[in-house]
């Protein structure tokens, strides 16, 4: 009897490492050429921060190859159901009573944050738990937990929560009627997301460089243009580290007096992500980074293509990372790293095999690489 030979990585996943390797070389070259950031600690820490997410994703795929992922998924999903029920109960109470679980008032209602320091952390936690339940969904009662999750997300009144809820219904329809999710569907979703948050986008953009977020987007393009084609280098722009080790860039482009971008208060420097990419690594680095992200999309599609529930959960997490990246440095923070690990490990069976023969371990969720590569 021929047994399975577990294969750790697809060729597309190996390409992720190559894209990011070249990306890091670009960062090193621009750092050496322009010598903008004088603090070596900032350079080393920034390099580590940006390489974390592909390293954790690839390592999680490899190291979890021998785990029983179905059992792991069920275990995590059972706990998630309990947490969602508790959080939902308090979300309803928070509507009618002041119980110290809100951060501010939006649309005339309290913005729910539960026990988190900010509602954005509640949003990311709910997204992860909701996706785990979607992947594990085997009872009609699970629909209740999904609905509760959606209500909780809406009650945070965060724009990214609204767009994620839209993504859930949009991608669910795509899988139902088209049987698959393509990259172009994600772009269509992005257009809908822009329409939903258009008023907020216009409001923020109207401030120009006198407000932190639009200033980062605008100056990021100027930085990429002036340091073509490789950008300004590690530790120079649009990251918490560039504030902690205050980068000369903010003085060079006259935004060092903008609230949230000053030497004494630089909390808003990580309120975006993409200016960090094209500002520090230039247009070449931006293309390489996008190529790595597209490769992760293909990786997810190939690993979960046999199971719609798992695929939906994985693509929702992928979509959330893209949504959140417009307003936070999710690719470099703990939340983003954890989401990549969840996609690789906690959404059920996604291992790949090079043989399909009589073996008792084979089931309908095992991926036959001959059918998709």
Where are these regions (language model features)?
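Transmembrane signal-anchor hairpin modules in multi-pass inner-membrane enzymes, especially those
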Residues: 1-29, 350-373
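Alpha-helical transmembrane segments of multi-pass inner-membrane proteins
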Residues: 74-102, 117-175
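Transmembrane alpha-helices of multi-pass inner-membrane enzymes
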Residues: 315-373
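Long extracytoplasmic/lumenal interhelical loops at the membrane interface
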Residues: 204-211, 215-218, 233-281
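A membrane-periplasm/extracellular boundary helix in multi-pass inner-membrane enzymes
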Residues: 95-98, 155-156, 173-210, 222
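Hydrophobic transmembrane alpha-helices and their immediate junctions
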Residues: 181-183, 280-322, 355, 359
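Aromatic-anchored transmembrane helix interface
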Residues: 15-31, 38-65
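Membrane-interface helix-loop-helix junctions at transmembrane boundaries of multi-pass membrane enzymes
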Residues: 3-17, 135-144, 179-182, 297-315
């Amino acid at each position: 009897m021929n047994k399975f030979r577990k294969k750790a990585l697809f060729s597309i996943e190996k390409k992720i490492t190559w894209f990011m390797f070249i990306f890091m070389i670009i960062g090193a070259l621009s750092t050496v050429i322009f010598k903008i950031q004088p603090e070596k600690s900032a350079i080393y820490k920034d390099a580590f921060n940006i390489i974390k997410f592909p390293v954790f994703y690839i390592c999680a795929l490899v190291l979890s190859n021998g785990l029983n992922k179905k059992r792991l998924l069920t275990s995590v999903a059972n706990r998630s159901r309990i947490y969602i029920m508790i959080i939902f109960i308090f979300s309803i109470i928070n509507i009618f009573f002041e119980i110290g679980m809100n951060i501010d008032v939006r649309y005339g209602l309290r913005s729910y944050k539960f026990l988190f320091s900010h509602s954005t952390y509640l949003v990311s936690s709910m997204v992860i738990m909701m996706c785990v339940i979607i992947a594990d969904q085997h009872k009609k009662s699970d629909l209740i937990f999904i609905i509760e999750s959606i209500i909780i997300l809406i009650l945070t009144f965060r724009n990214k929560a609204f767009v994620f809820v839209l993504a859930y219904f949009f991608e669910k329809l795509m899988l139902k009627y088209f049987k698959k999710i393509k990259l172009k569907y994600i772009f269509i979703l992005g257009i809908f997301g822009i329409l939903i948050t258009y008023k907020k986008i216009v409001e923020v953009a109207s401030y120009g460089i006198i407000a932190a977020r639009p200033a980062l987007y605008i100056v990021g393009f100027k930085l990429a243009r002036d340091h073509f084609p490789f950008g300004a280098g590690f530790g120079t722009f649009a990251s918490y580290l560039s504030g902690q080790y205050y980068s000369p860039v903010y003085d060079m482009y006259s935004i060092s007096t903008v609230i949230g971008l000053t030497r004494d208060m630089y909390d808003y420097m990580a309120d975006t992500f993409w200016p960090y990419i094209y500002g520090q690594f230039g247009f070449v680095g931006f293309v390489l980074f996008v190529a790595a992200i597209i490769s992760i999309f293909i990786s997810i599609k190939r690993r979960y293509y046999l199971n719609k529930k798992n695929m939906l959960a994985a693509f929702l997490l992928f979509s959330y990372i893209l949504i959140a990246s417009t307003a936070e440095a999710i690719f470099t923070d703990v939340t983003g790293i954890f989401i990549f690990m969840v996609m690789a490990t906690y959404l059920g069976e996604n291992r790949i095999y090079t043989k399909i023969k009589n073996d008792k371990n084979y089931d309908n969720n095992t991926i036959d690489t001959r059918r998709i590569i």
